[in-house]
Amino acid sequence: MPFEDRWTPEVYYDILRGIHRLGKTGKRITVSSIGQEALLPNNRLRNRLAELQTLGLVDTNMLVTTAGYDFCGDYTQFVDHFLRKYGLR
């Protein structure tokens, strides 16, 4: 699926996963590096990061919160499974 056609929860998941991966590798977490991981331009990413902070999924230091990890777990367990089952991903 082209990245411009992604559903908002999928974009959120990609951002959260990107932040997590950057943290695991010890790389500096910047808007640019998150954008590269999540395949988002910086202007769209900034808007999405603000939304994720409002939702409590990312903190002000751009780190994934417990709620963010819960979101990722639910996404992979339910949403991703559903999309794959019906060939939508």
Spans of features found by a protein language model:
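Short, locally clustered residues in the helix-turn-helix/winged-helix DNA-binding domain
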Residues: L16-K24, L57
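Accessory beta->alpha helical hairpin/"wing" motif in late/C-terminal subdomains of nucleic-acid enzymes
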Residues: N61-C72
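Helix-turn-helix/winged-helix DNA-binding modules
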Residues: W7, T25-G26, D59
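Short alpha-helical segments that sit at the start of domains
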Residues: M1-L16
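Short acidic, hydrophobic short linear motifs in intrinsically disordered regions
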Residues: K24-E37
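Short, amphipathic alpha-helical interaction segments positioned at domain boundaries
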Residues: D70-R89
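Short amphipathic alpha-helical interaction segments
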Residues: R6, A38-T54
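A short, conserved structural fragment
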Residues: Q53-L63
